[in-house]
């Protein structure tokens, strides 16, 4: 998972901050509760430690994004985190919205085990799009 701005890759100095952003992208703009985010990002810590780790990761993520002028692509509300979907492009979203297979290359956030569910869904949709194109040809 990588994020680019004006053709350059954003440098995340903290892996958990980057993973938090990856979770938000994976959820496509859906609001994610602090509890749910803590479960996803947890490395087996107790709930309080996991929640504290989310707060730290959020702070670092926000600081990184602000340094690139991108602080508004994520938002935090009372007990939830979300992505401002209108402010970013994602190749997988484009594939799904436009029914075009050229956007998807068969990989999806391979560094995160929690992304395997979405990968299965994307592979299924990719095959459906290819099959439809073959039938239309």
Predicted regions and their residues:
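Intrinsically disordered, low-complexity protein-interaction/activation regions
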Residues: 1-137
